[in-house]
């Protein structure tokens, strides 16, 4: 029997407000434990919440960017549960009347077709504190308590780990581009839970659902979904009963581990938040926020393909972050060579950034300097291989490519006469190569080119070297 997985994601994004959702405490990351707190976010008796208007602005902005309907009237609710990181013993969230509903994101499948993943709702809520487990016991840091979140709940429209990862990547790029969240998964400002079930292929009835937590990267999400799908199928095939439960992803061992049985909505005893009024929104307010939404990543990618004639794949990679997209666009315009700009950013520069765990906005050089490097190569001043050495030096020092080329004497040798002398000497020193070429071994040409480039320390123009090697070898063959 063939099975298929049914996947939905619940994504929490911390909003980029300067203060918390119901008080004036800072949302800055990394403060000493329990220093960004007050009676409101600690839930002390007599303290009353006052909703931060910026939270509503950002929630609506996210909803519009994600093709949602905006509810003209929505309400805050109390979600009741007892846990050490929840100081009030309830969380202020939204239940029946979320601020946004019925949106979607389009992802691209491997075959090039587009698939629409529905967004059921977006609601605003406050974050909980953070538990720190030590050998001596468990400590609680309430700095994060009251930090504003939006929870984006997808419909169960995904059917593979790759689709889930692509959905999350696209969601992240949209939220970051409209600047409602910095979406730093490593700092916990973007967190994802996956709901997974498995059913026989073609069946309409959904299987027993498991919720997976603790996935802090796109790769973790893919691995966790793949593992949990496999676990469900194996249990079904053995005839064992699946439990509706919450599990966590164990990154070290690449498995999911049971945490608790999955709660139902009535376990939380939702009821309206009595200390806050309803959120009422009119069309003028929505239109004002709509006007602040910039060009979205998928729109920018489509424009890049049309304007710069780069492949769709390049455009999709370059627009994953706005910083990379802007760096590419400026470089392409300054250099006049969009494909070279794309190749450098997606190739050597991305490799260097990944090795140092850096983002493009941390580069020591700018688009003007990268365009200068591209022009040095296109003009024949330096070779592409020398360019790779230059870009590493730019990455490490921030120096301009012209300065690096002059300081290190890297100007390409285009003197055909001088190169010919080296070519003839290399051929004279390697008579066996001529014999091999006569016997049909064309690879020796590359061997001889390599020797010439080594002799000239990479400075000889490789096009001239290739031409002269071919001419001289064919004379002798």
UniProtKB/Swiss-Prot annotation:
Record's protein name: Aspartyl/glutamyl-tRNA(Asn/Gln) amidotransferase subunit B
Organism: Clostridium tetani (strain Massachusetts / E88)
Signal peptide: none
GO molecular function: asparaginyl-tRNA synthase (glutamine-hydrolyzing) activity; ATP binding; glutaminyl-tRNA synthase (glutamine-hydrolyzing) activity
Family: Belongs to the GatB/GatE family. GatB subfamily.
Catalysed reaction equations from the record: L-glutamyl-tRNA(Gln) + L-glutamine + ATP + H2O = L-glutaminyl-tRNA(Gln) + L-glutamate + ADP + phosphate + H(+); L-aspartyl-tRNA(Asn) + L-glutamine + ATP + H2O = L-asparaginyl-tRNA(Asn) + L-glutamate + ADP + phosphate + 2 H(+)
Free-text function comment from the UniProt entry: Allows the formation of correctly charged Asn-tRNA(Asn) or Gln-tRNA(Gln) through the transamidation of misacylated Asp-tRNA(Asn) or Glu-tRNA(Gln) in organisms which lack either or both of asparaginyl-tRNA or glutaminyl-tRNA synthetases. The reaction takes place in the presence of glutamine and ATP through an activated phospho-Asp-tRNA(Asn) or phospho-Glu-tRNA(Gln).
Catalytic class of the enzyme: ligase
HAMAP family documented for this protein: GatB (MF_00121)
Lineage: Bacteria, Bacillati, Bacillota, Clostridia, Eubacteriales
InterPro entries tied to this protein: Asn/Gln-tRNA_amidoTrfase_suB/E, Asn/Gln-tRNA_Trfase_suB/E_cat, Asn/Gln_amidotransferase, Asn/Gln_tRNA_amidoTrase-B-like, GatB, GatB_C_1, GatB_Yqey_C_2, Gln-tRNA_amidoTrfase_suB_CS
EC number(s) from the headed UniProt entry: 6.3.5.-
Assembly description: Heterotrimer of A, B and C subunits.
Record keywords: ATP-binding, Ligase, Nucleotide-binding, Protein biosynthesis
GO BP: glutaminyl-tRNAGln biosynthesis via transamidation; translation
């Amino acid at each position: 029997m063939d099975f298929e997985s049914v996947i939905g994601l619940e994504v929490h994004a911390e909003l980029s407000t300067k203060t918390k959702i119901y008080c004036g405490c800072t949302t800055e990351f990394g403060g000493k434990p329990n220093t960004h707190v007050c009676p409101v976010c600690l839930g002390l008796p007599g303290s009353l919440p006052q909703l931060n208007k910026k939270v509503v602005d950002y929630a609506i902005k996210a909803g519009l960017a994600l093709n949602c309907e905006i509810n003209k009237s929505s309400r805050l609710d109390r979600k009741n549960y007892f846990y050490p990181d929840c100081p009030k013993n309830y969380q202020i969230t939204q239940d029946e009347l979320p601020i946004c509903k019925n949106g979607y994101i389009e992802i691209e499948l491997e075959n090039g077709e587009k698939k629409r993943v529905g967004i059921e709702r977006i609601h605003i809520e406050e974050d909980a504190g953070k538990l720190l487990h030590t050998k001596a016991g468990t400590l609680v840091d309430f700095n994060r308590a009251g930090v504003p979140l939006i929870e984006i709940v997808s419909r169960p429209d995904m059917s593979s780990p790759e689709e889930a990862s692509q959905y999350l990547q696209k969601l992240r790029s949209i939220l970051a581009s409209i600047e409602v969240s910095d979406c730093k998964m490593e700092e916990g400002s973007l967190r994802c839970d996956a709901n997974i079930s498995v059913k026989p292929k073609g069946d309409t009835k959904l299987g027993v659902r498991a919720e997976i937590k603790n996935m802090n990267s796109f790769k973790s999400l893919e691995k966790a979904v793949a593992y949990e799908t496999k676990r469900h199928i194996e249990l079904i095939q053995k005839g064992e009963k699946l439990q509706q439960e919450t599990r966590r992803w164990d990154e070290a061992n690449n498995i999911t581990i049971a945490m608790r049985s999955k709660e139902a909505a009535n376990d939380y005893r939702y009821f309206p938040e009595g200390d806050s009024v309803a959120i009422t929104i009119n069309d003028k307010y929505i239109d004002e926020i709509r006007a602040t939404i910039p060009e979205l990543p998928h729109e920018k990618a489509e424009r890049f393909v049309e304007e710069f004639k780069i492949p769709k794949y390049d455009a999709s990679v370059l627009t994953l972050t706005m910083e990379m997209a802007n760096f590419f666009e400026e470089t392409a315009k300054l250099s006049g060579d969009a494909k070279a700009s794309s190749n450098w950013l997606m190739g050597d520069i991305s490799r260097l950034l990944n090795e140092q765990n850096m983002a493009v906005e941390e580069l020591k050089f700018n688009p003007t300097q990268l365009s200068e490097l591209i022009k040095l190569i296109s003009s024949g001043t330096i070779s592409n291989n020398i360019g790779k050495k230059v870009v590493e030096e730019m990455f490490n020092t921030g120096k301009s490519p012209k300065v690096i080329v002059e300081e290190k004497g890297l100007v390409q040798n285009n003197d055909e006469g001088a190169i010919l002398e080296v070519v003839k000497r290399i051929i004279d020193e390697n008579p066996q190569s001529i014999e091999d070429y006569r016997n049909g071994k064309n690879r020796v040409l590359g061997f001889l080119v390599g020797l010439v480039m080594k002799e000239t320390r990479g400075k000889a123009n490789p096009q001239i070297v290739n031409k002269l090697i071919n001419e001289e070898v064919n004379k002798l063959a």
